[in-house]
């Protein structure tokens, strides 16, 4: 199973379920019921800052699975059929890789390195940034597209399909409906600005033709 395959499954799982990066990286197969297309989301894999090493002057951090701060962050979500198919194949591929590996640290994790250890969140960021640089994707303001923007995209797609804001709030597990509304409003304004810029270009070309 190639690294590119693992990243692709991770990105599409985050997008399809509106997950946070840490939530996806902490997923375990026991949290996923593929037969009934249901997933239990809650903990988050994070790198915690350690104590300062007096000799080196550096802090030794550690990876840890952190429980959600709010009750709404723990939830059972329905899995889109496309993501179910993706995860089924990923499970088969991972099992084959695990059998071929000399060492495999944790057979329960959904997303791992080539030796079964948790994926470092910073490495996920690096892989995502490399993909965006390769295909030339940026945000309208010129800044980098973040992994977290996949979550925002999920909200926008759901709204575009006619899903009500309260349901989207439950899917993204926001504690406040206002948070969900603010994200969608911000993204809508960006889309409207791009549309206005496109119209401005069209009008300019029309003006030159009309002269």
Task: Describe the residue ranges of each PLM region.
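Short, basic (Lys/Arg/His-rich) helix/loop patches that form interaction surfaces
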Residues: 1-8, 17, 77, 92-102, ...
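C-terminal secondary-structure termini that scaffold catalytic or DNA-interacting sites
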Residues: 36, 43-83, 96, 103, ...
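Residue-level signal for well-ordered alpha-helical positions
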Residues: 27, 90-93
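Basic, Lys/Arg- and aromatic-enriched nucleic-acid-binding interface segment
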Residues: 1-27, 35, 46, 70-74, ...
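A short, basic/aromatic helix-end/turn motif that makes direct DNA contacts
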Residues: 26-32, 169-175, 183-186
């Amino acid at each position: 199973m190639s690294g590119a395959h693992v990243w692709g499954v991770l990105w599409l799982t985050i997008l399809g379920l509106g997950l946070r990066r840490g939530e996806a990286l902490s997923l375990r197969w026991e949290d996923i019921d593929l037969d009934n297309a249901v997933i239990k989301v809650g903990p988050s894999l994070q790198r915690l800052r350690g104590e300062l090493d007096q000799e080196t002057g550096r802090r030794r951090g550690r990876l840890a699975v952190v429980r959600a701060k709010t009750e709404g962050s723990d939830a059972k979500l329905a899995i889109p059929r496309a993501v179910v198919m993706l995860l089924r194949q990923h499970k088969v591929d991972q099992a084959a890789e695990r059998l071929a590996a000399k060492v495999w640290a944790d057979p329960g994790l959904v997303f791992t390195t080539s030796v079964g250890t948790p994926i470092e969140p910073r490495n996920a960021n690096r892989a995502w940034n490399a993909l965006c640089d390769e295909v030339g994707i940026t945000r309208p303001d010129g800044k980098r597209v973040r992994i977290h923007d996949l979550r925002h995209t999920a909200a926008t797609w759901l709204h575009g399909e006619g899903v009500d804001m309260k349901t989207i709030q439950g899917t993204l597990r926001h504690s406040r409906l206002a948070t969900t509304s603010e994200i969608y409003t911000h993204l809508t304004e960006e889309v409207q600005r791009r549309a206005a810029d496109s119209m401005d270009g069209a009008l300019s070309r029309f003006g030159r033709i009309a002269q």
